[in-house]
Design a protein with these regions (language model features):
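A cross-family phosphate/adenosyl-ligand binding-site feature
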Residues: 1-74, 78-149
Length: 149
């Protein structure tokens, strides 16, 4: 499935259904090869180069006036700065930040350590916990924050 295919599917779902919250956890792919080959690339060449083109940014292009848009930012440095830039550039209501280089968090782990930011300035840290408990805490926090507006 390509990023364009995914974008079309999401747009169709948003036309047919109303969602309170839209969580977009990760990009399908940020880049795709410029040229595709249906043939096997032979291994006789020691090195090859691929030219990559940026794919459609699905999250940035979702337009839903009735749904909260919530994105994720996986960073290795300058996390808060980069997450807040993404919050603004993609017109999100909330962004959830985690670090790829943090031990016992993120990929290959059942636990995570997160930060939640809102477009209104909310900043909340969620200490290391199971991903299941964190997901419940995130939803509760977002609902509470929305009710307090």
């Amino acid at each position: 499935i390509s990023a364009n295919d995914m974008k079309k599917m999401i747009q169709e779902l948003l036309k047919k259904h109303k969602y309170d919250m839209i969580f977009m956890a990760a990009a399908v792919a940020d880049y795709k090869p410029e040229n595709f080959s249906i043939e096997k690339i032979k291994s006789h060449k020691k090195n090859i180069s691929l030219k990559l083109n940026q794919t459609t940014d699905i999250l940035k292009n979702i337009i839903s006036l009735e749904s909260l848009k919530i994105g994720f930012a996986l960073e290795t440095s300058d996390g808060e700065i980069n997450a807040k830039k993404k919050l603004d550039s993609k017109s999100l209501d909330y962004i959830i930040l985690n670090y790829a280089n943090e031990e016992n968090a993120g990929f290959d782990s059942n636990t995570n350590h997160l930060f939640l930011y809102s477009k209104e300035g909310l900043k909340k840290e969620f200490i290391l916990d199971t991903k299941y408990r964190l997901s419940l805490d995130l939803i509760k926090t977002i609902i509470k924050n929305e009710k307090n507006k």
